[in-house]
């Protein structure tokens, strides 16, 4: 029956293949023709029970890969700054466009400009974080860079009106305009974009009582410091002469360390007795 339905193919299979392999090959060949949407395909089965051919259809144009796919890449939102990942607004996060058409928020570009050394003309050149192409910053600072109107138009309606922002030293300052006529002025808002940290508050130093005014003698004593040293050295030399050198010169002259010679005690007693007798004789006369 199969031979009558497709005689040419079955006769070729009977000639080229053994008898016990003919039926599985025919079954595989018929499965290829019955698949929907495949058209006529040439099937080459390699096993007895060949798998059923599958014909995946083409992907729809513009179809993005599923987020759960391992190879899928998460695309950043166009309304976020690529540096700080903060949403754009109309104050410090205003979308500013560089000369290379890359867009970043105002605060990040102001920090980049503050970190760059000053050029010859006194203006900084900010390199793009993506392509490294330099962009000259105007004299007024980063707030004077061109605003991306294309991204600004995609913001909500209340953020499409750009607020006036200016640079004072290392601070971005803004004075938000009142949204309604009856709203009061909210004052100034600022953010520091400099590299230096704010100074820590120091504790107050206790005030000490002034020292009493020294007298004239103390002032003279402090003024003639060199003369004090000369006097001290002179006194030390005199003491050295009296204590050491005087006994030495006495020993060299007299041969004895005692420079003062004391009289004998007997001679002194006889002298006293003679004097007493002389006074007694004079009294009797």
Curated annotation (Swiss-Prot):
It comes from the Eukaryota. GO terms for cellular component: membrane. Keywords: Membrane, Metal-binding, Transmembrane, Transmembrane helix, Zinc, Zinc-finger. It is a single-pass membrane protein. The chain crosses the membrane at residues 230-250. GO terms for molecular function: zinc ion binding. It is found in: Membrane. The keyword Transmembrane helix applies. InterPro entries: RING_finger_E3_ubiq-ligases, Znf-RING_euk, Znf_RING, Znf_RING/FYVE/PHD, Znf_RING_CS. A zinc finger (RING-type) spans 81-132. PANTHER family: RING FINGER PROTEIN 223 (PTHR22791:SF4), RING-TYPE DOMAIN-CONTAINING PROTEIN (PTHR22791). This is RING finger protein 223. It comes from Mus musculus (Mouse).
